Amino acid sequence: MVRVKVNDRIVEVPPGTSVMDAVFHAGYDVPLFCSEKHLSPIGACRMCLVRIGLPKKGPDGKPLLNEKGEPEIQWQPKLAASCVTAVADGMVVDTLSDVVREAQAGMVEFTLLNHPLDCPTCDKGGACELQDRTVEYGLYEKYYQKGPLELPVYTRFEFTRRHVDKHHPLSPFVILDRERCIHCKRCVRYFEEVPGDEVLDFIERGVHTFIGTMDFGLPSGFSGNITDICPVGALLDLTARFRARNWEMEETPTTCALCPVGCGITADTRSGELLRIRAREVPEVNEIWICDAGRFGHEWADQNRLKTPLVRKEGRLVEATWEEAFLALKEGLKEARGEEVGLYLAHDATLEEGLLASELAKALKTPHLDFQGRTAAPASLFPPASLEDLLQADFALVLGDPTEEAPILHLRLSEFVRDLKPPHRYNHGTPFADLQIKERMPRRTDKMALFAPYRAPLMKWAAIHEVHRPGEEREILLALLGDKEGSEMVAKAKEAWEKAKNPVLILGAGVLQDTVAAERARLLAERKGAKVLAMTPAANARGLEAMGVLPGAKGASWDEPGALYAYYGFVPPEEALKGKRFVVMHLSHLHPLAERYAHVVLPAPTFYEKRGHLVNLEGRVLPLSPAPIENGEAEGALQVLALLAEALGVRPPFRLHLEAQKALKARKVPEAMGRLSFRLKELRPKERKGAFYLRPTMWKAHQAVGKAQEAARAELWAHPETARAEALPEGAQVAVETPFGRVEARVVHREDVPKGHLYLSALGPAAGLRVEGRVLVPAGGEA
């Protein structure tokens, strides 16, 4: 450890620590604009200037001592940027003297010279770092210890301010105000270093310098993070622009349930309306980043909500009270035998809801219990790796597309190939200026092998990569096990896997939907003692499996017919609904299939409004907290399942969240997550074959509202030769019918799609399956 004296305090920090982080560790403050967690420190803004001294040394190399027996300090002639200066043993740092304060105040004034006075209308007002630094470090007498400085408290700039483009949309989600930009370069460094999409840069020189792109748009699935890290109001979220002031919004820390990563998010609401989603720092999971689908795809939560129960009368659904809905439940279920009832939970159902459904299924003795998006092979088949395990690994073998299936894994793999290690944790948390991060760090492409059914974005960082046909995962894994000869790339991956001392295996839906491939993947990991990250289509797959939400030997799965009476926390495929005597749906939005088949539809909260817990792909238990969003009479699945139990004549073991918490603690659920295991012989393999491959996507179909409509639009990918044979011109709008529903999609020609296959996106939890289907023109005729 290195001993550093900051003002009057001595701290010990690891070698390589920046002076800035040593100052924070000592409990003092230093202003900053350009430094940001997880980005390279560059010393661009010069706000973090401090005075640095080192012990004088004699000819013998030993420190010279003063009269008090203390090392004599030689101060550097100029102030230094603390973010790019490393600590040294015996260093003395001064952050409080007038010379330091004067320099910091001068940098504040310099930054404000051309900054517009937009604070009354700027969305960053109240959360602006420039506002805060101006108040804290600007030209104010009270911040100087030796009396007032002889400096004016007004600007000395006597010329016309610079005026540039103020309203420049970079994409449908992000707008740039170039007048407010202070050239800290956070956004440019972010794209270069974190997702690896170099789409922003400085253009022109000198006073004419501005941030821009070569073309309209930010071709990255992680562009929204620049709105969080921008220190001023230069980059803003268009979904929330001009809708509320920062101090008017209520902040709710919760967890995103769109994918199995479980990123920390903050839901900002006002007057019952969800206005904005921001990343919440969870160092072990998403650090300070989230994907664009998680950030911008929230407008559906406020639009066209189902707010009252609906009961079928005279062939159509009509609004009803909860009392009337309960009576309809009792009437519709009065002849139901327990084993005829199916309980099917949504993919983002909480642990508490899963436990109640499991207990209720036991009481009813029904085998029909499942959750939306459950894969043929359970995630709990594999020992879970943590995201920090990935950074400590020496090789990653990926079968799937993390960018679409678990987006934050894309960012973690970016860190992994740059050889970054988890940073040291200080008193103030993650370092603000981590000196191990450099601009334009080379990426070690030999550390990753990636196989996917199309050209995945991460292939640019994998020296070993290959595009394969859907369903060939089992053959690739057989070759990796050494039981079959594979392609040249598979042979290279096998060699790298065998040489690795601490590898991690990452599996996508294509493997998890195939029990043979999954068993081979388990064997591959077991032989090497490797841990696995399983990218399930369901957000809480590990948690619901732990609660026993799985079909019995004769039970029908979530997408199959079977149970005569059924509760659904989602909209299942139409085939699963046919022939049902009584259907209860618990939905946040009314769906055409619910209007056609449901006998009772009950209003449900979205995951933004839920209280409970999820388990992510690491096996980590994560909290959900309810944001105050207007949802009418919506009730959670705990209350609805309890009502269903009473209608069936069964006493529910609990109905309140606190009671569910006690039941979870009694079962020691969090501690048991890592020990849960399955063997595939206990589960029925599913064979699905067809020309349509349901491609996993970051954006989900339900997000296709508001500004997310274009990003979440479904696409039908086809090889150009296949497209010509099927008469599918580039850009055509077609309708596609599959067992999982009808989707309007845009035709996209791609050379990396195998001939004879059609890839369809935006069907969410059905990802990774091969199914039969047909393409129709919008009018209904066959294409």
Curated annotation (Swiss-Prot):
UniProt keyword list: 2Fe-2S, 4Fe-4S, Cell membrane, Iron, Iron-sulfur, Membrane, Metal-binding, NAD, Quinone, Translocase
Subcellular location, record wording: Cell membrane
Catalytic reaction(s) noted: a quinone + NADH + 5 H(+)(in) = a quinol + NAD(+) + 4 H(+)(out)
Transmembrane segments: none
Main location: membrane
Entry's cofactor comment: Binds 1 [2Fe-2S] cluster per subunit. The [2Fe-2S] cluster 1 is referred to as N1b.
Entry membrane topology: Peripheral membrane protein
Role this protein plays: NDH-1 shuttles electrons from NADH, via FMN and iron-sulfur (Fe-S) centers, to quinones in the respiratory chain. The immediate electron acceptor for the enzyme in this species is menaquinone. Couples the redox reaction to proton translocation (for every two electrons transferred, four hydrogen ions are translocated across the cytoplasmic membrane), and thus conserves the redox energy in a proton gradient required for the synthesis of ATP.
Sequence similarity: Belongs to the complex I 75 kDa subunit family.
Record's comment describing the protein's domains: The subunit comprises two main parts, an N-terminal [FeFe]-hydrogenase-like domain (residues 1 to 240) that coordinates clusters 1, 2 and 3, and a domain similar to molybdopterin-containing enzymes (residues 241 to 767) whose first subdomain coordinates cluster 4.
Protein name (record): NADH-quinone oxidoreductase subunit 3
Species, as recorded: Thermus thermophilus (strain ATCC 27634 / DSM 579 / HB8)
Phylogenetic classification of the source organism: Bacteria, Thermotogati, Deinococcota, Deinococci, Thermales
